[in-house]
Amino acid sequence: VPFTEINGLKIYYEMHGDGDAIVLLHHGFGCTKMWKDIYPAFVDKGYRIVMYDRRGYGQSEKGSDFKAFYESDRFRPESVAELARLRDVLDIDSFHIVGQCEGGVVGIDYAVRYPHHVNSITVSSTQCYSTMTMAELNALKMPNPFRDLGPEIREKLIDWHGVDHAESFYNQFRTYGGAYGTGVFDLRPVLPSVTCPTLVLYPDRSFLFGVEQAEALYRNVSKGELAILPHCGHNTYDEQPEEYIRIISSFLKRHNF
């Protein structure tokens, strides 16, 4: 099983295919397993896929202070540093990023910090700004504890994070912290520093974020493109995988990647 050690913690990763690299960044409840219906199509199109479980997710170790880390200002810069280290370990020169929801925040932060590493970035269902604290927003949008979730999502979380951790992880992740933080969230100040082609791929009926978030992302980057998936819920990769693959592929082709 491919693990590498980053900051003293075992981080799980997978690499598939050859060609230009695409790094897939999972969302705030996810791990590499969520990409199972997405990555093979990109391998078939001649790309190399890199995906990994960020610290504390999936099969990666969380460390003794994970809760404090998750709720701290360290989360975003350390998530960037983790990807930079993985890039060194795998000896990849530059790559495309596809970030789902919170993964898009990690991707944008990375593209701002290391512009010469990033050929393009796609963000899907990523929040651009909040009008209330994340604690307030999440209490409104995700009121149900793990035991009150539907069986399908419970089983998925157990598959992703293990039977021992799924409930405590979900109940932690649904409060506040992670890439969206604990207070009022706003990506707009950093977006003008993203210099590569940027695709904003958004659903028209996310239970979390409205399409005005997509427009704000699109308006604030210098090389933005905007695609809205009609009749699609928050988890775009899961609800409309064929469209997800098609739109990202044509974006990459349009920029000669």
Predicted regions and their residues:
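Catalytic histidine neighborhood in serine/cysteine hydrolases
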Residues: 218-235
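Conserved HGGG/HGGXW glycine-rich cap/lid loop of the alpha/beta-hydrolase fold
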Residues: 9-65
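Short beta-strand/loop motif that positions the catalytic acidic residue
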Residues: 194, 200-202
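Active-site nucleophile elbow and catalytic-triad environment of alpha/beta-hydrolase enzymes
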Residues: 175-190
